[in-house]
Amino acid sequence: MRLTGLLCVALWSASAVVLAEHQPCRPPPQTHGNLWVTAAKGAPASVGEFNYDSQARKLHFKDDALHVNKTDHLEMLIFFEEGIFYDIDSHNQSCHKKTLQSTYHCLEVPPNATHVTEGYLGSEFIGDQGVRMRKWRKRVPELDGVVTVATTSCGCVTLFATLFTDSNDVLVFNFLDVEMKVKNPLEVFVPPSYCDGVALEEEGDTFFGLFH
């Protein structure tokens, strides 16, 4: 752990010398963990498990029914490259295939985002009590709002993100227990068999809109 920390410090120091300004970093190839999404009123909008492949640009998320008190539990499979997503109901074995209206999401830094700041989340001076992070911001016209993403300085793992819209809606995303792998990679990004042959519906949504 100490060696990893020293390596991160060394890499950060070297990059600070070479680069005159921060460029958006790239996330790890694969990540898996838990995602907590909180809406404007403070109640959890969704809590569940996510798997993300940044190279194939595919995301799977499924609500944890034990943590969220609602009747409709979200399960989605998003193909950002293809611009589609599947709204999945595994309980009733039903599936809707819809258009993804925007490819922006918060599991990686948006292209051309502005670097805001760099510092420690927690404490820099107490061992194992802080994480060095970078914060990025970008206005996204198709979302009518501003997306802010905070990542680790070394590794570019998303820690938390926010969407502030012009209509004063707020979504806060917190990423917990993140691992550098995908759970069941041969299955998690494959639509279930009852999605086969489902027609593409005219109705669409965005990554952020799915959590409203």
UniProtKB/Swiss-Prot annotation:
Give the transmembrane ranges.
none
InterPro entries associated with the record: Ependymin, Ependymin_CS
Would you tell me the Gene Ontology cellular component terms? extracellular region; lysosome
What are the boundaries of the signal sequence?
Answer: 1-20
List the subcellular locations. Secreted
PTM details?
Answer: Binds calcium through the terminal sialic acids.
Give the GO biological process terms. Answer: cell-matrix adhesion
Q: Which UniProt keywords apply?
A: Calcium, Disulfide bond, Glycoprotein, Secreted, Signal
Residues with an annotated glycan are: 69, 92, 112
Q: In which tissues is it expressed?
A: EPDs are synthesized in the meninx and secreted in the cerebrospinal fluid.
- Listed GO molecular functions? calcium ion binding
Family label: Belongs to the ependymin family.
The task this protein performs is described as: May play a role in neural plasticity. May be involved during axon regeneration.
Q: How does it assemble?
A: Forms disulfide-linked dimers.
Q: What is this protein called?
A: Ependymin
